[in-house]
Amino acid sequence: MTDGPIKVNSEIGALKTVLLKRPGKELENLVPDYLDGLLFDDIPYLEVAQKEHDHFAQVLREEGVEVLYLEKLAAESIENPQVRSEFIDDVLAESKKTILGHEEEIKALFATLSNQELVDKIMSGVRKEEINPKCTHLVEYMDDKYPFYLDPMPNLYFTRDPQASIGHGITINRMFWRARRRESIFIQYIVKHHPRFKDANIPIWLDRDCPFNIEGGDELVLSKEVLAIGVSERTSAQAIEKLARRIFENPQATFKKVVAIEIPTSRTFMHLDTVFTMIDYDKFTIHSAILKAEGNMNIFIIEYDDVNKDISIKQSSHLKDTLEDVLGIDDIQFIPTGNGDVIDGAREQWNDGSNTLCIRPGVVVTYDRNYVSNDLLRQKGIKVIEISGSELVRGRGGPRCMSQPLFREDI
């Protein structure tokens, strides 16, 4: 099969093309009263966050990675006036709770904007003061202090979650929280309308109309035959089974097994990749807290049964044994966040010490603040490229969260 614009058959193959989103004014629309609803714990300082993100992007370029930006691709995808109109309608249709019937006024604002300005405005949010219409609905006479007609999307710089590259295809995800639900609209339009992608016949394993929640931070491509997916607060067992069935049904897909790993449902353990990432052929970072006592985990191996013409599900309780079996590796090494220390491990996991981005086998990008974990990685033979992230980390995501690989070399 000829390679298209998407090819990701592992977590560790040399990264050639990546999708990023530079933090924008959406971060300046974060205010203390509404942090919880927008899934933030703190307010990053935009100027510094942008400098940190620009350095992250430059590090990737210096390692031979082509960096694409979500906001630029999205603007290039709506050049056709009809597509632009449909895009606006789709965004507004998912914002009815805050728009309060002012679609036409918002469309009038959008009509004054270029394609890039439109995308940036939708991402950053529309404040009520930008529209300031006369009160025409009873709800507007109520004592409503909420400042937005269109909510900002401050989580967009975590490009890992709204979509996930799997093989030559992609999942366009239904996000768990309403605050992030609109984020996958952008990749939907990019895949369907951008010149780089639209004629490539990219398999859509799951689309955003799927009734079940799934997020890219839970989707790991361990090899061309094995996926690992976290059953988490944000990714449902139903979505994992649906994804497995769709992949097994596709003759172009090479994947034979889907390993579903249950993790605690809490913000601390937001996605599988916040506690577990693959960094070399036989090495994984891991947060010790998810291991419990080995032999006490809920792990499920989903395969296609050729005899019964349906999926089969086997249960396991040992993560190390399961990975060694499905990957055909004799001795998997787990490298614990913060060296497994009860204090260092918890602190560095909170600051995404497990959330490494592998750019080729044995070479990772990490936050410099997680020095205990980084030193241990080096002791285990891993090359660690450190970036600063004092502002970026306030969104509770690391280098893997901030990147969506579109193309990796096979291993």
Swiss-Prot record:
UniProt enzyme class: hydrolase
InterPro entries documented for this protein: Arg_deiminase
One Pfam family in the UniProt entry: ADI
UniProt feature coiled coil, ranges: none
Record localization: Cytoplasm
Catalytic activity reported: L-arginine + H2O = L-citrulline + NH4(+)
Taxonomic superkingdom: Bacteria
Catalytic-site annotation from UniProt: C401
Pathway the protein contributes to: Amino-acid degradation; L-arginine degradation via ADI pathway; carbamoyl phosphate from L-arginine: step 1/2
Its EC number(s): 3.5.3.6
Alphabetized GO MF terms: arginine deiminase activity
Gene Ontology CC terms: cytoplasm
A biological-process GO annotation: arginine deiminase pathway
Alphabetized UniProt keyword annotations: Arginine metabolism, Cytoplasm, Hydrolase
Family note: Belongs to the arginine deiminase family.
Alphabetized NCBIfam families for the sequence: arcA, PRK01388.1
Name the record gives this protein: Arginine deiminase
Lineage: Bacteria, Bacillati, Bacillota, Bacilli, Bacillales
Gene name tied to this protein: arcA
